[in-house]
Structure formats: C-alpha cells, structure tokens
C-alpha cells in the first residue's frame, strides 16, 4: 500500500492525538522518589483509551512499590502482530508514563503544569514533550494501521513503562530482571525520548551516568563561636570545588561522537543548610551528576571521590565532644555503566536512516548523548536500540510544550518503520 495513504490517515487523527495528549497530561505521574504517587492513574487512563482498539494482546506488569498509589508501578505492553507474527524481528517503541515534578510554579506563565492548554500549535503542560508527545505518536502510528486494516511487516510492541525519570528500578530495569522472556536478541528498538528540532539526530551511544551524594557531618554551633563546632557547610564547599576541578582535569578526553564531546561533572543539589544566618550548620549535602565518556571507568571516579574525602577530612579534622569530625560519606544514588554503542550498520539504524531520508527529505546524523534513556538497558543485553524524536527540547522546563506538528510527523516515521 502507498505509504501516503497511511500518512493521510495519521493526519486525519490529528485532533484525536491532541485530545489524548491533553487527557494524559492532566494526570500527574510523578515518582514517589520525587514526592508523587506514581503512574497508576495515568496507566489506568491509557488502558481505558486503548481497551477497544484491536491490539492482538495487551499485557500489564505491576512492579511492587509500597510508596506508590495502590502499591504498584504499572508497565504496559501492547502488541500489534505483523504479517509473520514472531518469525521476523519485532519493533519495540518504548515511552514512559512518569514525568518530572513541576518545579517552581511561579515560572509557569502559560498554564499550570497539569492544566494543559493548546496554543499556537503547541500543547503546554508538564510531561507534554517528555514523554507524552512520543507516547501519543506511537499510539496513533499503530491506530492508523488498524483503521486501514494494514498488518505491518513486523510485529509492533508499544511499551509504556514507569520510573524512567528516577532510574527505571520499577520500570524497564524491573521488567528485564523479572520477565526476561519478553525480550529477544533480534528485536529492533526505538526509544523516542531524545533528538533535535529537525528530527535528524539518531542516538546510538550514551555516556555512563553516576549520581553521587556527598554527605558531610560537622557540629552545629552559633556562628559567633565557630571554634566550638565544625562548619559542615565550609567543608562541603571546599570538597565540592576541589572534586569539580579534579574530575574535569583528570577525565578531560573528548569524543566527537557525543554532544557535548567531553565528560560532564555538574554539582546539582545542596541540602541541609542552616535555617538562620547566625547558625554554622552541622550537616551539608552536595549532589554531583556525572555523565562520563565510555572510555572511563566509574570505579576510578568513585575512588577519586573517596580519596579526596579522606584528604579533606584530614585537613579539617578535630574532636568535638569526643567525636572525630568531619565525617564525609559518599552515596551512589544512581549508576549506569555505558554499554557498547549500537552498531551503525544494525538494522534499526539503517531503517530509521532510510525513513528520515525518504519521508523527511533530510540527511540523518548519528551520534551519542549524555545518557539516561532506555536504550542503554537494551544495549546491555546486546539488543540494538536507537533514540530518536523530533523535539524542541523543552523537557523539564517551566512552560514545557509539545509541538503538535512534531507529534504528527513522528507518528508517520514510526508507522513507516513498521512497514519498511
């Protein structure tokens, strides 16, 4: 069948796509790690939307999490069989249900985070671009095929999973650990959770990720009598600055496959400051987000951080009320060692390149990013995966939006992938 017929069908579903996206944005799906209830309500809404669609199979896998609503983090798989059912490689399209917290509400000037509005060809709201746009695009790519009675060349598996934003412990990582039978080495995987405004960037590699929290314990005292205690704030500031300089100097290699081409080490959070200007705090925390080129070993970075803790601790060492201070502890909040990149000549890369060239008339660019997508989990299993979408890159920002044209046009590419 002429692919243009499918594209016209997708265009005819534009308003349905917008309505679906608006409905999903209205439901907060913030992780319990970030103070939310999780994804239960959003998963229920999604199941309600697709219950009468002619999927061949819909499966739900609930990861136990007592902190979440009803004690579970839902993961949904919807299958639309291809012409050869299980005989040919299957195409996975993975999106996530969860969203990041709204942040500073005063900076949301177009609308409130979970009260979506449609304006100037965009849908505003938290989770609109990350990852609602691609979630809805994947749904309606398949819906168009269903409406036309078309079976794709290969089976499509739409995966809607939890916990992407805070580590995937209750999402894809849990699925792979508890249900390895779901995955096959010959699967083709598209993760539409990264890209550029032109829709030409195909990500095949990611940096390693290390989130580490440095906890400094001193002794709180009145700021006018600092000698009676130990100011944890001062110790933490020196430690953070010294570590920042050390990591940038020691791990300074560049790899032009990635953007940016160097490793990044960013102090992102601080905690436990004093609650009055005349208190020298007894505790302080600093968090580093490290995105490290695959050529480096994360153990070396952790060892450097630990060694520096010893040096800084020795510099400020003193006994207060019988206790030797400071105590500097390093906690690994998240760690993901970068797997080998998806080969440039793998089938999913070639198919996506062909679709972009043929149906967008643009030359695709292959590269790597700072990490943090589902693709890394598949690559660790030896399953080729790519990250691609057309994005204005408003994710995690106030006034986040999804451009409707991007959503519709990406649905066309997703449908084409299933047919090529």
Residue ranges and their predicted role:
Residues 1-5, 12, 41, 194-199, ...:
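Metal-dependent amide/peptide-bond hydrolase catalytic core
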Residues 2-124, 147-152:
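Acidic/His- and Gly-rich active-site-bordering loop/insert found
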Residues 73, 111, 153, 185, ...:
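Short, solvent-exposed loop/turn segments at the edges of secondary structure
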Residues 89-92, 122, 157, 187-189, ...:
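Structural motif
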Residues 94-96, 159-161, 190-193, 217, ...:
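Short beta-strand segments
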Residues 113-125, 217-218, 360, 392:
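Glycine/charged-rich beta-loop-alpha catalytic/anionic-binding loops adjacent to active sites
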Residues 121-136, 149, 227-233, 401-408:
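Short, conserved micro-motifs enriched in small and acidic residues
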Residues 129-205:
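Acidic/histidine-rich catalytic neighborhood of metal-dependent amide-processing enzymes
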């Amino acid at each position: 069948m002429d692919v243009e017929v499918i594209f016209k069908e997708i265009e005819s579903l534009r308003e349905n796509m917008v309505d679906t996206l608006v409905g999903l944005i209205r439901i907060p799906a913030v992780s319990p790690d970030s103070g939310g209830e999780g994804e239960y309500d959003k998963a229920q809404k999604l199941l309600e939307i697709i219950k009468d669609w002619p999927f061949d199979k819909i499966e739900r896998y609930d990861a136990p999490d007592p902190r979440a609503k009803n004690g579970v983090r839902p993961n949904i798989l919807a299958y639309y069989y291809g012409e050869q059912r299980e005989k040919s490689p299957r195409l996975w399209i993975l999106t996530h249900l969860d969203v990041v917290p709204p942040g500073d509400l005063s900076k949301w000037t177009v609308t409130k985070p979970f009260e979506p509005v449609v304006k100037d060809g965009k849908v505003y709201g938290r989770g609109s671009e990350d990852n609602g746009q691609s979630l809805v695009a994947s749904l309606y790519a398949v819906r168009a095929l269903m409406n036309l009675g078309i079976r794709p060349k290969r089976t499509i598996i739409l995966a809607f999973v939890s916990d992407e934003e805070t580590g995937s412990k209750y999402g894809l990582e849990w699925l792979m650990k508890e249900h390895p039978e779901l995955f096959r080495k010959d699967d083709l995987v598209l993760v539409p959770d990264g890209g550029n405004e032109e829709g030409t960037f195909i990500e095949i590699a990611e940096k390693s990720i290390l989130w580490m929290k440095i906890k400094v314990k001193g002794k709180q005292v009145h700021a006018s009598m600092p000698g009676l205690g130990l100011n944890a704030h001062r110790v933490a500031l020196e430690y953070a600055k010294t570590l920042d300089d050390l990591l940038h100097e020691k791990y300074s290699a560049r790899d032009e496959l990635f953007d940016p081409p160097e490793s990044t080490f960013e102090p992102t959070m601080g905690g436990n400051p004093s609650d009055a200007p005349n208190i020298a705090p007894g505790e302080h925390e600093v968090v580093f987000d490290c995105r490290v080129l695959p050529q480096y070993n994360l153990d070396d970075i952790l060892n450097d951080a630990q060694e520096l803790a010893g040096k800084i601790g020795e510099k400020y060492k003193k006994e207060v009320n019988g206790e030797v201070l400071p105590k500097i502890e390093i906690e690994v909040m998240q760690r993901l060692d970068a797997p080998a990149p998806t080969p440039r000549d793998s089938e999913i890369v070639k198919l996506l390149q062909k679709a972009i060239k043929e149906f967008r008339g643009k030359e695709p660019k292959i590269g790597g990013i700072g990490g943090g997508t589902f693709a890394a989990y598949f690559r660790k299993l030896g399953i080729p995966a790519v990250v691609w979408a057309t994005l204005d890159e408003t994710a995690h920002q106030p006034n986040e939006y999804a451009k409707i044209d991007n959503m519709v046009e990406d649905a066309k590419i997703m449908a084409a992938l299933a047919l090529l």
